[in-house]
UniProtKB/Swiss-Prot annotation:
Span of the signal peptide: none
Catalytic activity entry: an acyl phosphate + H2O = a carboxylate + phosphate + H(+)
Keyword field: Hydrolase
Its EC number(s): 3.6.1.7
UniProt-recorded name of the protein: Acylphosphatase
The keyword Hydrolase belongs to this UniProt entry's keyword annotation: yes
């Protein structure tokens, strides 16, 4: 089933390649959306795609980022809208 999730990632997550790593993983999983640095030092990710693929992306964010220190990942699941054609970094 297709879903959309809004993530807010906190910790030492800017300037360490997190957005690019998320971009690579999301693209490999067929997920669309974006990753963006926020002014408070966190990273926002919006991901659309297969629910299981999104769960795999979230697991990767929590455990697979070598240079980042992820303290928390807030998840807000939303109805799938198909707003994005690809995955982008802002």
């Amino acid at each position: 089933m297709k879903k959309t999730v809004h993530l807010r990632i906190t910790g030492h997550v800017q300037g360490v390649g997190l957005r690019y790593s998320v971009y690579q993983k999301a693209t490999s999983l067929g997920i669309t959306g974006y990753a963006e640095n926020l002014y408070d030092g966190s990273v926002e990710v919006v991901a659309e795609g297969d629910e299981e693929s999104i769960k795999e992306l979230i697991h990767f964010i929590k455990t697979g980022l070598r240079w980042a220190r992820v303290d928390n990942v807030e998840e807000r699941w939303l109805e799938y809208k198909g707003q994005y054609k690809d995955f982008r970094i802002y």
